[in-house]
Design a protein with these regions (language model features):
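Conserved class I S-adenosyl-L-methionine
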Residues: 1-24, 37-41, 124-153
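A short acidic, Gly/Pro-enriched loop at the edge of an enzyme's catalytic core
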Residues: 87-96
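Conserved S-adenosyl-L-methionine
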Residues: 180-190
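A short glycine-rich, Lys/Arg-flanked "PGG" loop and its adjoining helix->strand segment in the class I
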Residues: 109-124
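Short alpha-helix
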Residues: 161-178
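Core SAM-dependent methyltransferase catalytic element
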Residues: 177-178, 192-200
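Class I SAM-dependent methyltransferase SAM/SAH-binding core
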Residues: 29, 35-85
Length: 200
C-alpha cells in the first residue's frame, strides 16, 4: 500500500495529499488513475467518503483491481474514459485530481468543462502535468497537442496526444471554464533525471 502521495514526475519529493485539502468525508475522483496507487493511498490514509479511480485502459484497470480491489466499497475502480464518466456525473465530486493522468492526455476544451460540471459548488480540481516536454523542448504557447509514440497492450505501435502547455495557457483555459482561485507551482526535477512538473 503506498504510504506517500507525490505530485512530481519522479514520485519522490514535493507536496503530498495536502494539496487536495481535507478530503475526509468527501467524494473524490482520480482522472486517469492508472493502477490507482494514489487513490488507494487516499482511501486508506485520508478517509474520503468515496473515491472513484477512473481509467480507460483494460490493462491498468486489471492491475488496479488485483492490487486494490479489496479496498471497495470506499475505493471504486472504474474502467471508463474520463469524458463520458464526468459527463454523466454532474455535481458528484467535491475534489477531482490528476497526477500526470487524463488532464495531460485529453483535449482541455472538452475535459475542463466536463470536470467543472462534475464538481459540486465549491469543489476543487488539482492536477500535475509536464512543465516542458520530456526531451527538454519548451511547452506550447497555445492549445496544441504533441504526438507521442506508444504501444498497445499487445505491443503494437500506436500514437497518443499529450498537451504540454505554458502556464499562461493553462491559466486562461481554467479561467475561461469558470475556475477561480487558480494557483500553480513548479516542482523542479533532478537535473538530468526527471522533467519539471507544473502543479495546479
Amino acid at each position: 500500500m503506498p504510504d506517500r502521495f507525490f505530485w512530481n514526475w519522479g514520485q519522490d519529493s514535493g507536496p503530498g495529499a495536502e494539496a487536495l485539502g481535507d478530503v475526509t468525508g468527501r467524494c473524490v475522483g482520480d482522472l486517469g488513475a492508472g493502477t490507482a496507487r494514489h487513490a488507494a493511498h487516499l482511501a486508506v490514509h485520508h478517509q474520503p467518503a468515496h473515491i472513484t479511480a477512473v481509467d480507460a485502459s483494460p490493462a491498468q484497470h486489471a492491475m488496479a483491481s488485483d492490487l486494490y480491489g479489496h479496498l471497495a466499497p470506499r475505493l471504486c475502480l472504474t474502467r471508463c474514459g474520463v469524458l463520458p464518466h464526468l459527463r454523466t456525473s454532474a455535481h458528484t465530486y467535491d475534489v477531482l485530481y490528476s497526477v500526470f493522468g487524463a488532464i495531460g492526455f485529453t483535449e482541455p476544451h472538452e475535459l475542463l468543462p466536463a470536470a467543472a460540471t462534475a464538481l459540486r459548488p465549491g469543489g476543487r480540481l488539482t492536477f500535475s502535468t509536464l512543465a516542458h516536454h520530456l526531451g527538454g523542448a519548451p511547452a506550447h504557447p497555445d492549445v496544441q497537442h504533441t504526438d507521442m509514440s506508444a504501444k498497445t497492450p499487445d505491443g503494437e505501435a500506436a500514437h497518443m496526444h499529450r498537451w504540454v502547455l505554458q502556464e499562461q495557457v493553462w491559466r486562461q483555459l481554467l479561467d475561461e471554464t469558470g475556475f477561480t482561485r487558480i494557483s500553480t507551482e513548479v516542482l523542479h526535477g533532478q537535473p538530468g533525471r526527471a522533467p519539471s512538473t507544473r502543479s495546479w
